Amino acid sequence: MSKSTAEIRQAFLDFFHSKGHQVVDSSSLVPNNDPTLLFTNAGMNQFKDVFLGLDKRSYVRATTSQRCVRAGGKHNDLENVGYTARHHTFFEMLGNFSFGDYFKHDAIRYAWELLTSPQWFNLPKEKLWVTVYATDDEAYGIWADEVGVPRERIIRIGDNKGGPYASDNFWQMGETGPCGPCTEIFFDHGEHIAGGPPGSPDEDGDRYIEIWNLVFMQFNRQVDGTMLPLPKPSVDTGMGLERVSAVLQHVNSNYDIDLFKTLIDAVAKAVGTTDLTNKSLRVIADHIRSCAFLISDGVMPSNENRGYVLRRIIRRAARHGNMLGATDAFFYKLVAPLIEVMGPAAEELKKQQSVVEQALKMEEEQFARTLERGLSLLDEEIKNLKGDTLDGETAFRLYDTYGFPVDLTADVCRERGLKVDEEGFEAAMTAQRQRARDASGFGVDYNSLIRVDENTPFCGYEKTQQQAKVIALYHNGNAVDQIAAGDEAVVILNETPFYGESGGQVGDQGELKNAGVSFAVQDTQKYGQAIGHVGKLTQGMLRVNDSVDANVDSQRRDRIRLNHSATHLLHAALRQVLGVHVAQKGSLVNDSYLRFDFSHTEAMKPEQIRQVEDIVNAQIRRNLTVQTDVMALDDARAKGAMALFGEKYDDHVRVLSMGDFSIELCGGTHASRTGDIGLFQIISESGTAAGVRRIEATTGENALSALHRQSDVLQDIAQLLKGDSHNLTDKVRSVLDRSRALEKELQQLKAQQAAQESSSLSGKATEINGVKLLVTQLDNVDPKLLRTMVDDLKNQLGSAVIVLGTAAEGRVSLISGVTKDLTDRVKAGELVGFVAQQVGGKGGGRPDMAQAGGSDVSALPAALASVESWVAAKL
């Protein structure tokens, strides 16, 4: 009996754990250490800084099952998903890693043992083929002479991508940095499947399938292209869980493995179909995995960046559900079966289940409101299409008006043998939106300008002053030996009391000084393991190895500490009031206020906001001790400490406890007792995305000042109403009632005026071919009354065409009315549009009533004068 996907995942991790590897949890799909990356798309992403030498771990061997998404950006598999056997938006990457420990011999030996040993995967050795980089004689020799793979099944792959080291078998992190050859292992499905071995003209067939890639990082590529040997070569491997499961379960398509068969059955049940061969089922089964895990990791549907990629995937799934006959929201119903089939890999998703389901349902229902209309428009455009390509302007209109991502439009077109002019779509988007929605905010890693090998000890938990030594200086991203007055720079010290921005807490400000030298620290940032003091030298000359007094702005730090501690109290209070589904989605803590984003699907009620505020202030009055303990990460979790999912934590973590009320993992600076916070006030509560709410609040003196401002405003209002703050509500209600009564009276007077105006105007109508025509400009008439006047005039005149215009505050208002007996010849919408374009405007409406506006008041008389000839031509 073949292993299940869950058993294969666990077997991989167990094997490498038995070889001395640390089992590391999957990191978030949102990379927290690489702003150039849209989504985590490989197992090595969370170890990038380790490979670059910017981060150190307590272990030198690691193994993971990493959740990955490839949709959008460089790795965009979206259009192929569901139509091929192996393309996915979401997949799991099994990997083992060596950070300067073992290298090629052990990496290859481990891979062969796991794949072929009867105790593990027990694959037939004769079914396995291997590729190596053309000049990697070492790897070739290990496979041939030590492992015993026949040389005819070891294929050398050279530079097949147009340049030196540009090869399927040479891996590079970027244009510079760690790189090296790789060896790939392929499984031969047999002669009954079309395709040739790797490197052959028929290699794209499905017979030989790559199942494992072993990367040997042994070089450091320089700017000039030279390859320098790394002092400690490393290993990074990746094996797609879905691919190896297909091999071990003896099926040729990933969609036939147990995991996908379960999901496809769930999709069929949700949409009410029995045809399990329909490719739309595969599309939806894939998409629920990426969408659910992305939302669980904090991404919400939006029109920007990651949120827009998520929206595209959800809407593609919704459209395929529509094709299968789904009439109601169904996608969210797949979260529960997904959690069940993913098993231990879905623990975090299970905690967020209700939030994920609600976000999916809201997005699907929102799209459903425009899906049918958009598809009808697309059908109409395709019917009238000349050629085989839909123009970019139409694709953009579908996106802009009906929310159709361009790849969804491309899907529909492809099903009918058509293409989409995607370049034209991008041009239309740029011209009409003036911004690119799918890439903004990514692509520039400013921290990469500064590479610091040092580790800066932080001593700022205990003090805000420290004598230290300058160990590095950076000016314009380059290391320098000295800086002069006026230079902006980053200063690295051998130790510092300055807190580097992280965990939502802003970096410290202050001063570095010695005799005749002053460096104003405007911000503090982390550069790998180093803490950088960002600012400007205002006096003297600062050199590497100089001693300085590092002085944090302690008053500013104190305000930040209070706000940060209040954030923890707020988090715990929200979970009490709203439920344990509340999880932190982001935060900002500075010296003025705190901002806290959290998972919740609806706006908080005023009484809930008050309840949260009261709970936090009650904990402040309890004056709880704020205690910090350093312990193993597993011990902290066992103690119940809340962690921010996706955040990277060391093996030992700081656990912050506030009495019996709050316990969280946190590396920030805090009050010593909750009473130090003094006062907590919520300033605002709002939504930032589907399923994410935001609270802004303030503490201490800032909160007191906010209360004083509110009190002052109430006193000012009371004086204006000639009352006091005690009866202010009654006074305001009385004023509003009086205002509404006067407004009603005014509208009645205006209606009477309009009726009188209509009576006087009816006598000014002329006649064309038996039809009354009334065209006139009115002065000092409320534009809102024009519609009433037109209705009155139509009743008075009988068969008639009416155009009224008025100008007020530099704007033209136009209205056209046509009695129903004439709308087959004269349409009010066309008529008012004809007039509006002459006054710099546009408008439209029904055939019998239409309105428009314009900006050229001076052109109004001439525009109205042109109406008679236009109407005459129609009659």
UniProtKB/Swiss-Prot annotation:
Binding positions (Zn(2+)) = H564, H568, C666, H670
Q: How is the cofactor bound?
A: Binds 1 zinc ion per subunit.
Pfam family, any one: tRNA-synt_2c
Q: Which reaction does it catalyse?
A: tRNA(Ala) + L-alanine + ATP = L-alanyl-tRNA(Ala) + AMP + diphosphate
User: GO MF annotations for this entry?
Assistant: alanine-tRNA ligase activity; aminoacyl-tRNA deacylase activity; ATP binding; tRNA binding; zinc ion binding
Q: Which InterPro entries match?
A: aa-tRNA-synth_II/BPL/LPL, Ala-tRNA-lgiase_IIc, Ala-tRNA-ligase_IIc_anticod-bd, Ala-tRNA-synth_IIc_core, Ala-tRNA-synth_IIc_N, Ala-tRNA_ligase, Ala_tRNA_ligase_euk/bac, DHHA1_dom
Give a short account of what the protein does.
Answer: Catalyzes the attachment of alanine to tRNA(Ala) in a two-step reaction: alanine is first activated by ATP to form Ala-AMP and then transferred to the acceptor end of tRNA(Ala). Also edits incorrectly charged Ser-tRNA(Ala) and Gly-tRNA(Ala) via its editing domain.
What is said about the domains? Consists of three domains; the N-terminal catalytic domain, the editing domain and the C-terminal C-Ala domain. The editing domain removes incorrectly charged amino acids, while the C-Ala domain, along with tRNA(Ala), serves as a bridge to cooperatively bring together the editing and aminoacylation centers thus stimulating deacylation of misacylated tRNAs.
Instruction: Give the record's subunit note.
Output: Homotetramer.
- HAMAP family reported for this sequence: Ala_tRNA_synth_B
* This protein's name: Alanine--tRNA ligase
Q: What lineage, starting at the top, does this entry show? A: Bacteria, Pseudomonadati, Pseudomonadota, Gammaproteobacteria, Enterobacterales
